[in-house]
């Protein structure tokens, strides 16, 4: 009986792109998967056809050979020659372990069989700091749930007194070679899943995984000068690798809390300093806060609200080295409230001495404003 065309099996045209082929494969594989059709021999046979068509049409070299020679390209020698060497799979059949891995790996993101022991996963920890801690540096203890190397089998997964055995199928390489017509295809060993070893007697504590769940405590040193968004890497403090492989890393993500007085921009600090209008007019000294304590700020006479005063070296020292930032104090002139009769009278006399609200001599910005307003209305009435 002639074999059905691979494109017809998947229901795609011969011009189909790989994306279309994969989409059709996933849909059909789910429909005819043996787990969904237990005991149905026709579904099992259909599933094998779908698998074979998918493997050929998603491999550029195999697809080119098939397009040119048809099924004849893969009929010379069948799947003999390189084989699994005792795996028990016939000349034209496909390894069901590999099929299941492909179907559910492609659909759910797992990919094909595992290749040897893999590196442990990286972990992330979000750490909140006060501004003072971020500026000065701090050492903090944190607790993180993770996977650690089993302390009984030391990551091997094997029972104490035993060792993992070399896989008899792949002879420890983790790979097997299959001949398909003109091609030799290498894939993960279906017996050991690419590790090259088998655990006959698993560890009683980790049950052969080589890792156990645990919450560990770490002391993390935060360098001075860090800011929100900075990330600190602790090499080897992530999850333990599989069966003795390299551990992952831990990344501490820094978030600095909002401060009641200071705002930070880069290595500079900003704060608002309220003063009364008498000091703004006459000048004087006022205490202002810094991260190192109080210092005196000299305010010159005739200071306007919004004026910035820079105190050099009172900011943050860069975590990457270099000069220290500055503290910039923004003056806010406050209008007096809760005045008694005497104070009100004094202010009235002061206002009269200014020559009214426009204050030509003493309030140049006010005069300029009202002159502009007068000109605006004069222009409207012309």
Curated annotation (Swiss-Prot):
**What cofactors does this protein use?**
Zn(2+)
Quoted from the entry, the domain comment is: The J domain is necessary and sufficient to stimulate DnaK ATPase activity. Zinc center 1 plays an important role in the autonomous, DnaK-independent chaperone activity of DnaJ. Zinc center 2 is essential for interaction with DnaK and for DnaJ activity.
Q: Which residues bind Zn(2+) 2?
A: 167, 170, 189, 192
Q: NCBIfam families attached here?
A: DnaJ_bact (TIGR02349), PRK10767.1 (NF008035)
What is the protein's major site of localization?
cytoplasm
Query: What is the protein's species of origin?
Result: Enterobacter sp. (strain 638)
Q: Which GO cellular component terms are attached?
A: cytoplasm
Q: Which PROSITE patterns match?
A: DNAJ_1, DNAJ_2, ZF_CR
Q: What is this protein called?
A: Chaperone protein DnaJ
Q: Which keywords fit this entry according to its UniProt record?
A: Chaperone, Cytoplasm, DNA replication, Metal-binding, Repeat, Stress response, Zinc, Zinc-finger
Q: How does it assemble?
A: Homodimer.
Coiled-coil ranges (or none): none
UniProt xrefs under InterPro entries: DnaJ, DnaJ_C, DnaJ_domain, DnaJ_domain_CS, HSP40/DnaJ_pept-bd, HSP_DnaJ_Cys-rich_dom, HSP_DnaJ_Cys-rich_dom_sf, J_dom_sf
Q: Which PANTHER family match?
A: CHAPERONE PROTEIN DNAJ (PTHR43096:SF48), DNAJ HOMOLOG 1, MITOCHONDRIAL-RELATED (PTHR43096)
Cite the repeat ranges for CXXCXGXG motif: 150-157, 167-174, 189-196, 203-210
Q: How is the cofactor bound?
A: Binds 2 Zn(2+) ions per monomer.
Q: Binding positions for Zn(2+) 1?
A: 150, 153, 203, 206
Q: Which SMART domains match?
A: DnaJ
Molecular function as annotated in GO: ATP binding; heat shock protein binding; unfolded protein binding; zinc ion binding
Taxonomic lineage is: Bacteria, Pseudomonadati, Pseudomonadota, Gammaproteobacteria, Enterobacterales
């Amino acid at each position: 009986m002639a074999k059905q065309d691979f494109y017809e099996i998947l229901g795609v045209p011969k011009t189909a792109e790989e994306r279309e082929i994969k989409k059709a494969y996933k849909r059909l594989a789910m429909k005819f998967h043996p787990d969904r059709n237990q005991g149905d021999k026709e579904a099992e046979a259909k599933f094998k056809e779908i698998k074979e068509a998918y493997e050929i049409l998603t491999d550029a070299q195999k697809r080119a050979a098939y397009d040119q020679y048809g099924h004849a390209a893969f009929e010379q020698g069948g799947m003999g020659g390189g084989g699994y060497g005792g795996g028990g799979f016939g000349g034209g059949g496909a390894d069901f372990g590999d099929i299941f891995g492909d179907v559910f790996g492609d659909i759910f993101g797992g990919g094909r069989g595992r290749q040897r022991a893999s590196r442990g996963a990286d972990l992330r920890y979000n750490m909140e700091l006060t501004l003072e801690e971020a500026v000065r540096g701090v050492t903090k203890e944190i607790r993180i749930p993770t996977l650690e190397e089993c302390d009984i089998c030391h990551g091997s997964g094997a029972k104490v007194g035993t060792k993992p055995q070399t896989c008899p199928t792949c002879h420890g390489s983790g790979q097997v070679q299959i001949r398909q017509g003109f091609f030799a295809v290498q894939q993960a060993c279906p017996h050991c899943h690419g590790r090259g070893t088998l655990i006959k007697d698993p560890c009683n504590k980790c049950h052969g995984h080589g890792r156990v769940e645990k919450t560990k405590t770490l002391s993390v040193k935060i360098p001075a000068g860090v800011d929100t968004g900075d990330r600190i890497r602790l090499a080897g403090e992530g999850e333990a690798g599989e069966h003795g492989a390299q551990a992952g890393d831990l990344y501490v993500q820094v978030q600095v809390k909002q401060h009641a007085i200071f705002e930070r921009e880069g290595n500079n600090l900003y704060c608002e300093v309220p003063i009364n209008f008498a000091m703004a007019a006459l000048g004087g000294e006022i205490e202002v806060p810094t991260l190192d304590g109080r210092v005196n700020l000299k305010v010159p006479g005739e200071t306007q609200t919004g004026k910035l005063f820079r105190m050099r070296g009172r900011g943050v020292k860069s975590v990457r080295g270099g000069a220290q930032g500055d503290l910039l104090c923004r003056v806010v002139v406050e209008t007096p409230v809760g005045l008694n009769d005497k104070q009100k009278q004094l202010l009235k006399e002061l206002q009269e001495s200014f020559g009214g609200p426009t204050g030509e001599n003493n309030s140049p910005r006010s005069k300029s404003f009202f002159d502009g307003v007068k000109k605006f209305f004069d222009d409207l009435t012309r």
